[in-house]
Structure formats: C-alpha cells, structure tokens
Amino acid sequence: HLHQALDGRGYEITCVELADGDDALDFFRTNDTRFDLAFHCAAIVGGRASIDGSPLGVGTNLALDAWYMRWLVRTGTPRAVYFSSSAAYPVVLQQPGDVRRLYEEDINLQYMEEPDATYGWAKLSGEKLAGYAEAEGCRILICRPFSGYGEDQDPCYPFPVFIQRAKRRDDPFEIWGSGSSTRDWIHIDDLTGATLALLDADVTGPVNLGWGRATSFDDLARIVTAAAGYRPRLKHRSDAPQGVHHRVSDPTRMLNHYVPTITLEEGVRRALNT
C-alpha cells in the first residue's frame, strides 16, 4: 500500500522485502546507499497468539531496528519513518473500566513503563534508538498505528478472521475473550494517507494513527455480520489469548494534518466484497 502510494507520486523506490527470504540485516550492515527518505515497516509480528506464544521470535525486531538506525546514521539519510506500535503504550493504561484514550506523551522514554509483551518492548526500544539517530542528524517521524486493517490483511489478525467467519455465516460466531475489549480500527489506506500527510507537513516525533473511536469485539462482530446479512449467536472463549482490555488513541496530532475517510462500516463492506 505504501509502495503504491509512493509510486503514484513518482518516487524512485528501493525495497528490502523480508517476504522473499532476503536478510534485511545484511542490507543494513553492508549497504552504503544514501537515500532521501527511508521507511521502516518491517517486523516479526502476528496476531495475539504470535505475540504471546513466540516472544523470542518477536524479539528479533530489536536487531532489525538497531541496524536500521545505524544504517541511517552511517549513510547520512536525512529523513526517515519508523513504524512503532500502539503496543508500546503502558499496559497499566489499558485496563478494564472506562476507556482511556492514549496520548503520545503517555510514553516517557526516560522512565519506561511496561508495554505489551516482547513486541511492545521491541517497539519501545526502537523509539529510543530513533532518538539516538535523530541526535546524529536524521529527522525521524515515528508512527504509532492502532488497529490497522484492510481487505488483504494476513488471516492471523482478528479483522480478517471475523470477515471469513461472516462469509461462512458461522453461527455461533466465535470471539476470543469476553467481547467487551475495545480497539481503535483504522483502514490501511488511511494509515498510508496519514503517514504521507505527516511527511508533507515535515512532522517529526511520535504520532498516533487512529480514529479515536472505541469499538468492542462484540460490536465488531455485529457490524460484520449485519453487513453480511445475518445475526448469529456470539460465542465467547475465555481460554483464548485476549491482550489488553482497551486500546484507543487520541488522534489530535494526526488530525492536525490528516482526517481519515474510511469508516469501519465501509472497511467491512469492502472486505466482504473482496
């Protein structure tokens, strides 16, 4: 999605693609090309089962982030984007009870609080490393996406799982956890649009990417199944991985430069029609 958007702007693009089996670490260790702009989107990640079940695998992200930041400084790349995550926010702020919006200032890199699992620690460390790279002259935008989704998302994530269940017309409709946990959903096209708008505005530092709207998994299931034209019974699995209870952004910084356009309902319709 990002590649397509940049290509549409006429950029000359070089990709280091992990999916092809290449070792991105080797690229950052040995390549000395100076680019005008660099994006770091790569990470070992997956759904909740992957984050909880493979902490050492996810920890590999630390090496990737470190070599990327060193490469930025070594090559003198003047402008860069680091995709962090909402998982970097302290889990203590994402507990049951009233929904608390997460502000960029809730992460203090001088006094770091417990983030969400190894994945959150890796992203938090990546943000710390970005600060060191900035001190060496590279201006870095740190994007903190919340619950990104889209029509072509990997099926290990909740959104495509819900879409597939609705396409099969599952009844009962299975939901991991109580169904009351909330997430802040933002479509991949809006994530891409927001990132480029922030770059155009020459923004640096951390920016939340989200709508600022709390949607429970029960509500997501109802939206998806209503769009699919049926109303199943919801079946909750308390034994399945659940993650934090609430994760919702305060998107004020983003909204100064970009307003998302694809509602969750529209995103669901697109996915069901794919």
Task: Give the location of each predicted region.
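Canonical Rossmann dinucleotide-binding motif of NAD(H)/NADP(H)-dependent dehydrogenases/reductases
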Residues: H1-Y11
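Adenosine-cofactor binding site in Rossmann-like domains, unifying the SAM/SAH pocket
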Residues: Y11-T30
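SDR active-site strand-loop-helix element
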Residues: V16, A38-I44, A80-S86, C143-P145
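NAD(P)H-binding glycine-rich loop region in Rossmannoid oxidoreductase-like domains
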Residues: F27-L62
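Conserved Rossmann-fold NAD(P)-dependent oxidoreductase catalytic core, especially the SDR/UDP-sugar
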Residues: A66-D116, L141
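NAD(P)-dependent short-chain dehydrogenase/reductase
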Residues: V92-R101, L124, K128-D184, I188-L199, ...
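Active-site helix of classical SDR
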Residues: T118, A122
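C-terminal substrate-binding subdomain of Rossmann-fold SDR/epimerase-dehydratase oxidoreductases
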Residues: K167-T274
